[in-house]
Every structure is written in structure tokens, then in C-alpha cells.
Amino acid sequence: MSIIIRVEDLRAVYLVREGTIKAADGISLDILENSVTAIVGESASGKSTIIEAMTKTLPPNGRILSGRVLYKGKDLLTMREEELRKIRWKEIALVPQAAQQSLNPTMKVIEHFKDTVEAHGVRWSHSELIEKASEKLRMVRLNPEAVLNSYPLQLSGGMKQRVLIALALLLDPVVLILDEPTSALDVLTQAHIIQLLKELKKMLKITLIFVTHDIAVAAELADKVAVIYGGNLVEYNSTFQIFKNPLHPYTRGLINSIMAVNADMSKVKPIPGDPPSLLNPPSGCRFHPRCEYAMEICKKEKPKWIRLDGEAHVACHLYEEGRPLK
């Protein structure tokens, strides 16, 4: 598979009263065409910042300090807004986090579709809009006749999430980015959304990128996994290899903390300690205060991003020292 998006040394921060939050600190990542890539990490690890920076949709206090995001050889970060508007939704679409808050409660669903079309300079007649919107709603297993004239408050959380996905698909993008698509949903609805995304991927042959704090969701849906910790990318590999042979101590900790329905509680091992403050992150490797394998060098120097066999990449001093995780 060829590379459809290349992220190079992406650094993004938030300016707050207390100081500067270093939310994405030197992220480099290749997204392969027609792949499903999960960006996984704990809450407040910088996952959402990465995709917001990639799409230049950071909030007003967000700043991109450096880096490149290459799409078809062009850097999205240096494009003017009018250039970006030609790409957003038509080629790269973003489904925001929190379906409950992402739809305007005073507007019917059909009005959201109309606004999306107008915002991106597409000229459709009313009948064309209804036809296209209905087609996308059916794709996400919603009844257009029932949904188009409904207000968001008349829809369940799962229905709102599917409406957002339908809106994102309206202009037939080739890349679909989803921020926590299963958060704030009950377990059954989560399963339905995951299955829906699998079907859409197969049907439309698009590239999916999604953010999640739940590595079990990544196991269900993704074929590539990028693991984020404290604003740093610490591991990237195929999903199969991530679960078969996790390279980074943090990745292993995430996997060991998964609790199955029939889990032996004595074998479930939560990661000790708390995630770092990105206002004042630890020196060296940001995971070292919680890592059972930490060495003196981990406290002083940030580990290099190393490519190992095949697709495997890891940022860990164990591999620089020739002492891989066992």
C-alpha cells in the first residue's frame, strides 16, 4: 500500500493561563492508503490534538509550532484556507468527538446536511440534497424519512453518531478521520458503530484514521496502531504485532490492563501511577516515572524513534541499549 498522508515532526501546543501544554511533541507517522489506523492512548495524551493539527482544526488557543502534513505531495499546514476548503469533506473528512454536542439542537438534520454542502461550495438543488443525504443515511443504517426532519434531541446517542458519519461521507472523501467514535456510548451501541465502520471501509474502500483511549476498540477495527503517551508517539506497528509482541512498556501495560468479561482479576494489571501533566512533562522519556524497566538514561534523554523489523517502530532506550522488552 502507498502512503496517503505523511506526518513529519508535528509539534502542537495549547496556550493556557498556567503556561504551555505540549500536546503533540514531534509526531512522525505514515498513513497507508486504504488502511485503518488507530491512534491509541490514555485521556489527555495528545491523541485528539494530533488529528486536529493534521486537519488545521485546533481550537483558538492551539498553535502548530512545526512539522509537515503531506497529502498528495502538498503540505496541508502551509495551505491557505481557501485551498484547504477544497480538500476538507471532499477528500479528507473529520467526525468530531462527542456526538451529543456536535449537532446544533435548534436545527433539523436536513439543515445540517444543507449547511455542510454550502460551507464547501457545492451547488446542489434541494432534490439533489435530499437524494444524497438519504443515500448516506441509508449507508449508516438510518431511515432518511424518519431522521432528516428530526431534531438532534429526538435521536439517541448512537443515531447522532451515525448522522455525523453520514455528514462526513456526504461529499465522498477518500480519508475519514474519527475522534473517539465509540466514546460515551453503551457497549451494544459501540459494537454497532464498530461493525458499521468495518462495513463502510469495505464498501467505500476509504482510508480510516480514528482516535481511541480503548485499545480493545483498536483490536476490533484497526490494522495499524499508533500508541501515544504524554504527547509522544511511542510505538507503531500492525495490530497483530502490537498484541502479539508489544515493544514499548506502555503498550504492554495498555494490553495487560484490558479486562475481559471472564477475566481472572489477579491477571489484570493496571499501569501504576498517573499520566504526566503536559504543562510540565517529565524529562527524558515521559513514561519513565511509571516504567518498571526505567534506566538512568530514561530520566535524562528522550528516546529516538527507531525502526525495527518490518513496520515496527518504537521510541524506547531498551532498544537503543540492545535490551529489548521480554
From Swiss-Prot:
It comes from the Bacteria. Keywords: 4Fe-4S, ATP-binding, Cell membrane, Iron, Iron-sulfur, Membrane, Metal-binding, Nucleotide-binding, Peptide transport, Protein transport, Translocase, Transport. It comes from Caldanaerobacter subterraneus subsp. tengcongensis (strain DSM 15242 / JCM 11007 / NBRC 100824 / MB4) (Thermoanaerobacter tengcongensis). GO terms for cellular component: plasma membrane. One of its GO terms (molecular function) is metal ion binding. PROSITE patterns: ABC_TRANSPORTER_1, ABC_TRANSPORTER_2. The C-terminal iron-sulfur cluster may stabilize the structure of the C-terminal loops and may function in the regulation of the transport process. The gene is dppD. The keyword Nucleotide-binding applies. This is Dipeptide transport ATP-binding protein DppD. Part of the ABC transporter Dpp involved in dipeptide transport. Responsible for energy coupling to the transport system. [4Fe-4S] cluster binds at C285, C291, C298, C316. The lineage of its organism: Bacteria, Bacillati, Bacillota, Clostridia, Thermoanaerobacterales. Its EC number is 7.4.2.9.
